[in-house]
Amino acid sequence: MKKELTDRQKKILDFVLSYIDSHGYPPSIRDIARAFRITPRGAIVHLNALEKKGYLTRGKRARSIKVLNRSEAIRLPVVGTIAAGNAIEAIENPTEIIEVPKAMIKIGFDHFLLRVRGESMIEEHILDKDYVVIRKQNTANNGDIVAVLTNSNEATLKKIYIEPEKIILKPANSKMQPIELKPENVKILGKMVGVIRIYG
């Protein structure tokens, strides 16, 4: 059984998968380092951890990353657009189906995809037009990235912090301000567990 990934390891694995899908070949160490604003040595440390946990293998040549069990994919519906910025749009009906790696899916939970609009989560490497994988659940821990619906029927993707008298929805963008709402005005739709990026 594969060991569980850290948040950063999961994001790097997601990036590798999306890069391969878009380019037809794996990213280089520098591609990964540039995408996550880390040093090449830092990228190697994360890749070594992913290899040790059984998610990929690496050869001695450049661009030799191979993701294991690549054929294991799950088809998930894209149910609409979610704001990573100001809350702008309620979740809609399914619009398309996209395959996602089985490693992102937790058995016993329902999952769906949302397309991101905006730049409020860029410091978590979630960009405009990315797809986020959401695990359906109505609870969350402080610091989780969640999809929420407000009492004005607007959906947004933010880090959540729960206090007795309020819920703080915090963007991952130092240029933007947190949103504070009463607990009764926030409905948690699910926790983000992965990011899919389609290039081109």
UniProtKB/Swiss-Prot annotation:
The protein's UniProt keywords, in alphabetical order, are:
Autocatalytic cleavage, DNA damage, DNA repair, DNA replication, DNA-binding, Hydrolase, Repressor, SOS response, Transcription, Transcription regulation
Q: Which Pfam families match?
A: LexA_DNA_bind, Peptidase_S24
Query: So what does this thing catalyse?
Result: Hydrolysis of Ala-|-Gly bond in repressor LexA
InterPro entries for the chain: LexA (IPR006200), LexA-like (IPR039418), LexA/Signal_pep-like_sf (IPR036286), LexA_DNA-bd_dom (IPR006199), LexA_repressor (IPR050077), Peptidase_S24_LexA (IPR006197), Peptidase_S24_S26A/B/C (IPR015927), WH-like_DNA-bd_sf (IPR036388)
Q: List the disulfide bonds.
A: none
Which residues of this protein are catalytic? 120, 158
Q: What class of enzyme is it?
A: hydrolase
Q: Does the keyword Repressor apply?
A: yes
Against Gene3D superfamilies, the record matches this protein to: Umud Fragment, subunit A, Winged helix-like DNA-binding domain superfamily/Winged helix DNA-binding domain
Any Gene Ontology biological process: DNA replication
Summarize which parts of the chain are annotated to bind DNA, as ranges.
29-48
Please give the superkingdom of this protein's source.
Bacteria
Q: What's an example of a GO molecular-function annotation for this chain?
A: serine-type endopeptidase activity
* E.C. no: 3.4.21.88
User: Which family does the similarity line name?
Assistant: Belongs to the peptidase S24 family.
HAMAP family given in the database record: LexA
Q: What does the annotation say about its assembly with partners?
A: Homodimer.
Q: What does this protein do?
A: Represses a number of genes involved in the response to DNA damage (SOS response), including recA and lexA. In the presence of single-stranded DNA, RecA interacts with LexA causing an autocatalytic cleavage which disrupts the DNA-binding part of LexA, leading to derepression of the SOS regulon and eventually DNA repair.
State what protein this is by name: LexA repressor
Q: What is the lineage of its organism?
A: Bacteria, Thermotogati, Thermotogota, Thermotogae, Thermotogales
